[in-house]
Curated annotation (Swiss-Prot):
This is Zinc import ATP-binding protein ZnuC. Its EC number is 7.2.2.20. GO terms for cellular component: plasma membrane. One of its GO terms (biological process) is response to zinc ion. ATP binds at residues 43-50. Pfam families: ABC_tran. The complex is composed of two ATP-binding proteins (ZnuC), two transmembrane proteins (ZnuB) and a solute-binding protein (ZnuA). Disulfide bonds: none annotated. Part of the ABC transporter complex ZnuABC involved in zinc import. Responsible for energy coupling to the transport system. The keyword Translocase applies. The gene is znuC. It is found in: Cell inner membrane.
Length: 264
């Protein structure tokens, strides 16, 4: 059976509570992720974002509450970072081929979609932050996900590189018709087609559209008024395109950042 109704959640968290010893990491978390939606989770360091992600992926069992995965759920996961042994270099091509049950044609499709053909013989250890994220995203797509989970995908990537990654994520979502759950430490740039931002600080502090959350008193208390006034939206209508190092590399489908409240 295919998941084709927006009324059926891909994942549902019901009254989740996680306790480590005497410390409550999460409590009263209720969250549903529907097909073809984009959800961004933000929150302060130590607020439980990583714990929530582990529970959602069933890598950690909650102390209380229920995690429901739809039977047809296919997750593509992009971790915040991976550890690579420096003494054992591995090429991008070899790294992608490590995933079992994947054909060369499927790897080639992912390489072309993420525009990383020029990197296939490069050492993983020598990739820039933006290049690494492209490769990790390509690997996640090999699972043909209907839910793409991105853990801090913009970490270590400069502003222009972030815009380029958002472009790729948007294109990926359109091609695969998948939902996206993105975990971030801030709201400086969010996808323009984000349906909901969820702010976590051990519990759900506030949730809603990016504009609503950035002006919520609880969010401002956590992140500061100046931060809340500098939320920008990636949009996918452009007049030029950057590479991962921020250089303008071609004219065609492009990107821009529309800033909210600060006139940038």
């Amino acid at each position: 059976m295919q998941i084709n109704s927006i009324k059926i959640p891909l994942i549902e968290l019901q009254n989740i509570k996680v306790v480590f010893g005497a410390k409550t990491a999460l409590q009263n978390i209720n969250l549903s992720i529907y097909p073809n939606t984009v959800i961004t989770i933000v929150g302060p360091n130590g607020g439980g974002k990583s714990t929530l992600l582990k529970v959602l992926l069933k890598l950690l069992s909650p102390t209380d509450g229920k995690v429901i995965h739809h039977r047809d759920l296919r997750i593509g996961y992009v971790p915040q970072k991976i550890h690579l042994e420096q003494s054992l270099p591995i090429t991008v091509e070899k790294f992608l081929s490590l995933k079992k049950g994947i054909s060369k044609a499927e790897i080639q499709d992912a390489i072309e979609l993420l525009s990383i053909k020029h990197l296939i013989h490069s050492s993983m250890q020598k990739l820039s932050g933006g290049e690494m994220q492209r490769v990790l995203l390509a690997r996640a797509l090999l699972n043909k996900p209907n839910l793409l989970v991105l853990d801090e995908p913009m970490q270590g990537v400069d502003l222009s590189g972030q815009i380029e990654l958002y472009q790729l994520i948007h294109q990926t979502r359109e091609k695969l018709n998948c939902a996206i759950l993105m975990v971030s430490h801030d709201l400086h740039i969010v996808m323009a087609d984000t349906n909901e931002v969820v702010c976590i600080n051990r519990h759900i502090c506030c949730a809603g559209s990016p504009e609503k959350v950035s002006n919520d008193p609880t969010f401002i208390h956590l992140f500061g008024d100046q931060f809340s006034q500098n939320v920008a939206f990636y949009t996918h209508h452009h007049n030029h395109q950057h590479n991962m190092h921020g250089d303008v590399c071609c004219i065609g489908n492009k990107h821009s950042v529309q800033c909210i409240n600060n006139g940038r």
